[in-house]
């Protein structure tokens, strides 16, 4: 809703055009980028978001996921990706079901999965 500069449809974007990609958190991410807000462990990621994350990961682009959006990394990249949702126990169990690894950290820290080039920050989690 708040943007600076040009905004375009994700369907027209390609990961190769970017040096890195950041996904915001908050309720908007949990209900618009994916269905986690409504479906929890049964969530689906919006198709263009999933395509873009997979494309960026395949191109070894750094990916940042904040607040609740690490569930997107956990669902799309799944097996072995290391993420954090802060100290949130219930959601940590959900991402483990998908094959991701959750590491609890303080809200003032970040977690870097160097192998996958994925950075996650808990924000309010």
Residue map of PLM features:
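Active-site-adjacent pocket-lining segments in enzyme domains
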Residues: 3-125
């Amino acid at each position: 809703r708040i943007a600076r500069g040009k905004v375009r449809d994700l369907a027209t974007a390609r990961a190769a055009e970017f040096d890195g990609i950041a996904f915001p958190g908050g309720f908007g991410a949990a209900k618009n980028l994916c269905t986690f807000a409504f479906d929890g462990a049964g969530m689906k990621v919006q198709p263009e978001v999933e395509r873009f994350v997979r494309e960026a990961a395949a191109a070894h682009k750094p990916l940042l996921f904040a607040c609740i959006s690490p569930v997107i990394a956990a669902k799309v990249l799944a097996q072995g990706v290391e993420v954090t949702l802060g100290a949130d126990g219930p959601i940590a169990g959900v991402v483990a079901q998908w094959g991701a690894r959750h590491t609890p950290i303080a809200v003032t820290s970040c977690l870097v999965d160097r192998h996958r080039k994925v950075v996650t920050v808990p924000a309010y989690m």
